[in-house]
């Protein structure tokens, strides 16, 4: 396995070198505001996964508490850090999960559309419109309005992309849910340029 967070750090440096200096400064300040943040309201191991169903890109509905499963929250298809992490999980986690009898599910607040299936992902991608599941798990936050013009410039209107009035996103988070729908592992990353290591995910699944 490679080192996902090393790859993410290299991506962060690459992004900073390819955007105008004023945008790079906003992104740097935005990220630094999350470094060291602890998601104290996040669900704890041993609690039940909310009994919700979410839509996939084809319009079907999938129960998120139907384990054993690894549930990965990401910000959206527009986020390069998310795309790198999801591709890594597909390559390094998904094959092992199939051998262990567990599923891999990715969740973002982005509206279900073709963009959710354009990253060559071979696992289920769900849409948590309005962040209902994310809020229930205590892993959402509202973005700083001062950063909105920068994000609008880079990716477009997040509110439009997500189909919601609130400018709200989930922290990148990985949960492992057992066969009874109970959360056995949760790892929340307020710093959106870091992610859960694939080895830690697999260890949590093997411990079920």
Residues covered by each model-derived region:
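Chalcogenol-based redox active-site neighborhoods
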Residues: 1-208
